[in-house]
């Protein structure tokens, strides 16, 4: 009797060990590779999550580099503009900035608008009579700030989408794994751990992968939303000062 009990315990331990091995990531991948026809949905879910993760990390890196660059450029460019002795030298300095530097582009748009309005002044029924210099420069600055603010949003929609949908994509894999477990129970006529370990493991792994993809995307979206808001506020402050400068001809700093 004791011997039978020991054999049963040993068999139970072996079954439990086999079940645990079937619930691992390596076993899931090996099963998906060896039986691709049975795991079409699993492959679609897994590849979708991998693509979503790759795209979200790509835009996270891009936004980190862009935020770091803008943080260093903001004070340097604006200070250089106001510290330059005259407007012509300040404009020339802005023209020497990199093409993707937003603060210099805003300043150049304001300068071009002021120069264009000045040339149009005095013409019969021309621009100078339709809009004042202040209104014309203000319109140009609004357009410039809107353009540069929009450029900051690159990848933000994707990060928000990944953060919101990746868990549900993982849940699709979870549901499919549970469905597979039920099918296996029906086929074998028993609900032993050996019968359902593989599908249940797949379900849990897909849930974990979905969360692994979504959580960094959510953190990145929230972080860059805050940093972009701070940068846009700097755009607005610089634009207001530029408006006063080009509309009146007097420095505000």
Regions found by a protein language model. Give the residues of each.
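Hydrophobic membrane-targeting segments
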Residues: 2-79
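Helix-termination/interfacial motifs at the ends of transmembrane alpha-helices
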Residues: 13-32, 37, 152-225
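Short, flexible segments with low predicted structural confidence
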Residues: 49-52, 62-63, 123, 206, ...
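Alpha-helical transmembrane segments of multi-pass membrane proteins
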Residues: 58-69, 215-227
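Predominantly long cytosolic amphipathic alpha-helical stalk/bundle segments
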Residues: 71-169, 180-192, 219-253
């Amino acid at each position: 009797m004791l011997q039978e009990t020991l054999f049963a315990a040993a068999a139970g331990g072996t079954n439990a060990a086999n079940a645990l091995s079937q619930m691992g990531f390596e076993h899931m991948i090996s099963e998906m590779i060896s039986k691709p026809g049975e795991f079409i949905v699993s492959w679609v879910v897994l590849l979708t999550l991998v693509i979503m993760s790759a795209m979200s990390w790509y835009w996270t890196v891009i936004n980190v580099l862009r935020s770091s660059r803008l943080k260093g450029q903001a004070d340097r460019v604006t200070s250089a503009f106001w510290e330059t002795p005259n407007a012509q030298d300040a404009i020339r300095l802005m023209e020497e900035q990199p093409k993707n530097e937003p603060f210099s582009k805003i300043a150049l748009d304001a300068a071009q608008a002021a120069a264009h309005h000045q040339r149009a002044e005095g013409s019969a029924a021309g621009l100078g009579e339709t809009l004042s210099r202040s209104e014309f420069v203000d319109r140009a600055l609004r357009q410039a700030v809107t353009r540069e603010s929009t450029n900051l949003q690159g990848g933000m929609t994707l990060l928000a989408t990944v953060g919101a949908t990746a868990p549900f994509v993982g849940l699709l894999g979870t549901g499919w794994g549970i469905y597979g477990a039920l099918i296996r129970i029906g086929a074998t006529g028993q609900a032993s751990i050996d019968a359902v370990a593989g599908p249940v493991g797949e379900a849990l792994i897909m849930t974990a992968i979905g969360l692994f993809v979504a959580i960094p995307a959510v953190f990145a979206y929230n972080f860059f939303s805050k940093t972009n808001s701070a940068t846009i506020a700097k755009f607005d402050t610089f634009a207001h000062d530029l408006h006063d400068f080009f509309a009146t001809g007097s420095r505000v700093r």
